[in-house]
UniProtKB/Swiss-Prot annotation:
Residue span, CRAL-TRIO domain: 139-297
Catalysis: reaction(s): a 1,2-diacyl-sn-glycero-3-phospho-(1D-myo-inositol)(in) = a 1,2-diacyl-sn-glycero-3-phospho-(1D-myo-inositol)(out)
Protein purpose: Has phosphatidylinositol transfer activity. Involved in the regulation of the phospholipid composition of plasma- and endomembranes. Altering plasma membrane composition may provide a possible mechanism for multidrug resistance. Contributes to efficient phospholipase D1 activation and phospholipase B1 inhibition in the regulation of phospholipid turnover. Forms a complex with phosphatidylserine decarboxylase PSD2 that seems essential for maintenance of vacuolar phosphatidylethanolamine (PE) levels.
Primary subcellular site in the record, as a coarse category: cytoplasm
GO cellular component: cell periphery; cytoplasm; cytosol; endoplasmic reticulum; endosome; endosome membrane
GO biological process, one term: phospholipid transport
Assembly and oligomerization: Interacts with phosphatidylserine decarboxylase PSD2. Also interacts with PBI1.
Keyword vocabulary terms for this entry: Cytoplasm, Endoplasmic reticulum, Lipid transport, Microsome, Transport
Name by which UniProt lists this protein: Phosphatidylinositol transfer protein PDR17
Additional notes on this entry: Present with 5040 molecules/cell in log phase SD medium.
Cysteines joined through disulfide linkages: none
Cellular compartments annotated: Cytoplasm; Microsome
Length: 350
């Protein structure tokens, strides 16, 4: 559907006896979706550009500022080297994501990666002891007490499903809402299994009338633009598609205002007023949208379970990163896997 077209779905609900009770995140897509594919080869020219980016961040003398103001102003008083966690983030796939997002322009890819590394330091996402003010689950937990953002299930390409339910808004607009988006993006991308880099976002604008919900109105443009900049600048090539449903008139007006700020790649991935079931298998979809998962959000159950599972998963992959040398450019295929031997050495040409 086009951006300003509207379509209504009247598919009947799934019979109750077929529903699957669910109140927690799960980390494994169905086995029938297959094993992780091997890494796709790149051209000789692309490989040379990849290696140029790799060499830049392999430099032992590389030091970066702790905040974007210092980066923009060329201030180096508080520069520090890359931590092990930052090297873990700088995977082969990460380099390629930034290269693709920058149309294989090496200088722009390095600039984008540098900006994101500094931004991650500033917002508290390095996951190391050097984080002065880490972005923790406790810091944003109150934002999700009504379940307005949920990671649940996978599409048939094994991409995690990230639900955003604007009609379950429980807090006034603030920077903490941006922080929650960042925290949940980190969660969704961490949940992505071996061989998967992208996520699918499902946005529901339906108004819910429950205790704790204060509004179903769209956020202020300032907050929305901040969130959009986070997605486009710091999570490039992470969005597979974004499906939006139950869009009221005021949300259409909001989307029209935001549309000019979307980059062409993001615009191409937006799908308006199509049922989620057109894109997701029933066994992986919330029953609210004619799926089979009888999902009930209980904050005291879902939130701590999600935090522990994802923290444990991240640490497990970091331990594998250290096992395989702890160097810049290791493949996520190796850190996400179960195998004992390194399949993609940093200097390997694919």
């Amino acid at each position: 559907m086009g951006l300003f077209s509207r379509k209504r779905d009247h598919t009947p609900a799934v019979p109750k006896e077929k529903l699957i009770p669910c109140d927690k995140i799960f980390l494994d897509p169905p086995a029938k979706y297959g094993n992780a594919p091997l890494l796709e080869p790149i051209s000789e020219d692309q490989n040379e550009k990849y290696r140029a980016v790799l060499r830049h961040f392999q430099d032992d003398d590389l030091k970066l500022p702790e905040n974007l103001n210092d980066l923009d102003n060329g201030t180096h008083a508080n520069d520090r080297p890359l931590s092990d966690w930052e090297k873990f983030w700088l995977s082969r796939e990460c380099f390629l994501r930034y290269l693709r997002a920058n149309k294989w322009n090496t200088a722009n890819a390095i600039k984008g990666l540098t900006k994101t590394l500094v931004w991650r330091r500033e917002i508290g996402l390095t996951h190391g002891k050097e984080d002065k003010d880490p972005l923790t689950a406790d810091k944003v937990a109150v934002e999700n007490e009504t379940g307005k953002q949920v990671i649940l299930g996978f599409d048939n390409a094994k991409r995690p499903l990230y639900y955003m339910k604007n009609g379950r808004q429980n807090t006034e607009s603030s920077f903490r809402q941006v922080q929650e988006l960042v925290y949940m993006m980190e969660t969704a991308t961490t949940v992505a299994p071996q061989g998967v880099e992208k996520i699918t976002v499902l946005v529901d604008f339906k108004s819910y009338k429950e205790p704790g919900i204060i509004t179903d109105k769209a956020p202020p443009i300032s907050i929305a633009r901040m969130c959009l900049n986070v997605m486009q600048d710091h999570y490039p090539e992470r969005l597979a598609k974004c499906v939006l449903i139950n869009i009221p008139w005021f949300a259409w007006a909001f989307l029209k205002m935001m549309y000019p700020f979307l980059d062409p790649a993001t615009k191409a991935k937006a799908i308006f007023d199509e049922p989620f079931e057109n894109h997701i298998e029933p066994s992986q979809l919330d029953a609210l949208y004619n799926g089979l998962l009888d999902f009930k959000y209980k904050h005291e159950v879902y939130w701590p379970d999600m935090v522990k599972k994802v923290d444990d998963l991240r640490l497990k992959r970091f331990d594998r990163f250290l096992k395989f040398g702890g160097i810049v450019g290791l493949s996520e295929y190796d850190t996400k896997g179960q195998h004992d031997e390194l399949k993609y050495p940093v200097d390997m040409v694919i």
